[in-house]
Amino acid sequence: MDNKDNRKFYLIREDVLPESVIKTLKVKDALKNNSNLSIYDAVKQFNLSRSAFYKYRETIFPVDEKILDQREFTLILYVNDIVGMLAQVLNAISQLQLSVLTIHQSVPIEDKATITLSLNARNSNLSIDEVIESLREINHVTKVDLISMTM
């Protein structure tokens, strides 16, 4: 079995990444946005060694860049149990131009419930972060977490 078959992938927040990995992302972005920029100049601009850049450049990608083809992800929303809460969430999903693939609402316990949504964002230009922020702004939504995505 090829070693590539055994690779695991993780979703990790940017603030816990090593500085060299973050700089690698910045260098990649600079190179993508300026075709005249050389790798030498880009790593120099961000104070990153070329060896670190070459080590990480094919191993780190922003989440949204990796899901451009599929654009499917699953969120869990923690909500207060009020009449019409699910309708409010579905209305927001529609306004964000997202398609619902699956949906599950838990039985409320102590006036709290969860709504788990698998979504397709092919028709939306929003990033996952923008979707999460929009859903967090709905009244009575107390928390929104990304729990999976298709890559």
Swiss-Prot record:
Q: In this protein, which residues make up the domain named ACT?
A: 74-149
Protein name stated in the entry = UPF0735 ACT domain-containing protein SERP1207
Cysteines joined through disulfide linkages: none
Q: Which family does it belong to?
A: Belongs to the UPF0735 family.
Q: List, alphabetically, the InterPro entries matched.
A: ACT-like_dom_sf (IPR045865), ACT_dom (IPR002912), UPF0735_ACT_dom-cont (IPR008310)
Which HAMAP family does the entry mention?
UPF0735 (MF_00707)
